[in-house]
A protein has these predicted regions:
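Fe(II)/2-oxoglutarate oxygenase catalytic core
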Residues: 1-110, 114-144
Length: 144
């Protein structure tokens, strides 16, 4: 899928993306720079993912805040993706996948990120750190 100019520059502005775990770079696969400082966060997310999807294996956690959610295909996924949506007073933000709109608020969704998908427009997103305890009570929805 060819990226438009908007898609290539979508991370600029006020969006915030933090990636921890194993990352690919031109120097090969390596542990991300922020990984060691994010261990408490990684432990909580790992606990939630293992509880909801015991067979799911992953190497990287990407946390997005104010992400524009354009239509895209995840570039380096080997298998499925899990999307955890956490926030307060969220309106919108559903996942568009395979021609369907899938509600995401307070949910964990498993889907194939190698297929086109996007986050629909949303408003009022909360900072993640004080919401981590809410992750332990998140529900699941599995995309077809």
């Amino acid at each position: 899928m060819e990226k438009t100019r908007f898609q290539r520059t979508a991370y600029h502005g006020k969006s915030n993306n933090v990636v921890v775990g194993l990352n690919w770079s031109f120097q090969g696969t390596r542990l991300g720079a922020r990984t060691m400082s994010a261990l408490p966060y990684i432990r909580v997310v790992t606990q939630v993912v293992q509880k909801l999807f015991p067979e799911f294996a992953y190497t990287t956690i990407s946390t997005n805040r104010d992400f524009p959610g354009y239509l895209h295909i995840d570039g380096k996924n080997v298998g499925p993706s899990v999307m955890l949506t956490v926030g307060e007073a969220i309106t919108g933000g559903e996942l568009w996948y395979d021609g369907k709109v899938i509600p995401t608020a307070g949910m964990a969704i498993c889907f194939d990120g190698n297929n086109p998908h996007m986050t629909l427009p949303y408003s009022t997103w909360s900072q993640v750190p004080h919401l981590l305890p809410k992750l332990l009570h998140i529900g699941t929805r599995v995309g077809d």
